Regions:
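Charge-rich amphipathic alpha-helical interaction elements
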Residues: 1-119
Length: 119
């Protein structure tokens, strides 16, 4: 029976592809955690902004300063929501780019492994 002269190299390529897949899974977990943190921050921030608006409305009903503060608070909420949405988009774009790159690297490793002659 002949021994496979490329067995070790084939095993190394398989291990490298597996490590790349593991790194991608870890990155996805980090991404999901980050997106959850963004969502939690956004929820908390909007709750606080709503509570602030209710307080201002209760304490200073119909004053011009009250209207200015409410308008400023609403603008801050909108800016925060836009920033959170931008962060979601940027994070997902980064993940998709890394995913495509990693998938390509994994495919290359698997192709290299498949091209090795058996002998």
């Amino acid at each position: 029976m002949k021994t496979d002269i490329n067995e070790e190299e084939r095993a190394q390529l398989k291990a490298a592809a597996y490590r790349k897949e593991q790194q991608l899974e870890e990155f996805q977990q980090v991404k999901n955690g980050y997106l959850q943190l963004l969502e939690n921050f956004n929820t908390t921030f909007n709750d606080l902004a709503r509570d602030y608006e209710e307080t201002v409305n209760d304490d200073l009903a119909h004053e011009a300063a009250n209207e200015d503060e409410l308008a400023a608070n609403q603008e801050l909420k909108q800016q925060t929501n836009r920033t959170i949405a931008d962060q979601y988009d940027a994070t997902n774009q980064l993940y998709n780019r890394i995913r495509r790159q990693s998938d390509g690297e994994i495919d290359d490793l698997n192709k290299q492994r498949s091209r090795l002659p058996w002998a």
